[in-house]
């Protein structure tokens, strides 16, 4: 859904990053109109934003030319969302106190659209009690969402919190402001990625899972309001914003981390491509090729989904007060996808299972898109196709109904 975005730019060194943010918004189809504070113009010229948006830039409350084109009240009504990035300590203080002494703060008071605030400033300023109190005031204000700043080296040379997050993070939080919070108050546990089973210090058994589907599901659950923990095997993917990530390598490590957390969640969704077997006698040193045996003795890994199903899954009778998460598995099959997935769901004791095809041109391993089939109870299979981001959102929308039963 294309959004009408009013981007407020206040006067900090991070103002130059707003140019990249505008490009990202326009690229995905959003319509953007920029409003700048007087101090912001010391860092970036209005002409830059006008060139990027092909729209006039608001800089002063009583600019007759701008008011003739679109007045500040009309701009406030036009917006689907007001995004303040970067938000300086000064502008945050004005917002918290309800001040309206320039065009930007006037629009912020007049709009009934969601307001997304992305603070960016020196670490010591960000940590100051008054700034934190003002941010808390905004968090408690209806329709306001505060994006936490990144930590790292700042323009002033200090290291700490205060950096403006990258555009993908801001865009994800922008979308979250428009997402129905169907998972609000829910705790979700996901596994993702491959596992690696060591043969020796240089070799291991693994599979080509990229982890993209699991990470997309983590991001989508967070967007829908859930508190998300992601237990991840080795991947090259960035952690979705707001998601707690636990890194593991082997299937045994993943089993331990998942089982330790499952009792406290509402959904346990096992997306990881976990190795079924591991070398029985791994070496902690690299074994010379000349000394390696022609055969490799293997032993079974613990079955994470089966153990979840046995403890919490379908058909298990628990105490009335006992938390029992919805157990959802994934089945990667090369043939007879629906039938084999349905059998796996029953065998493992899962409440639901998501089936996808691997092998051949439609394999989902490492791909950007996917076609999956959701099997839940006696319901007819539901099929979802698209990018993994789109499929993840559709799966959660479908599963949200099962959480209400």
Q: What is the role of each PLM region?
A:
Residues 1-405:
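A cross-family phosphate/adenosyl-ligand binding-site feature
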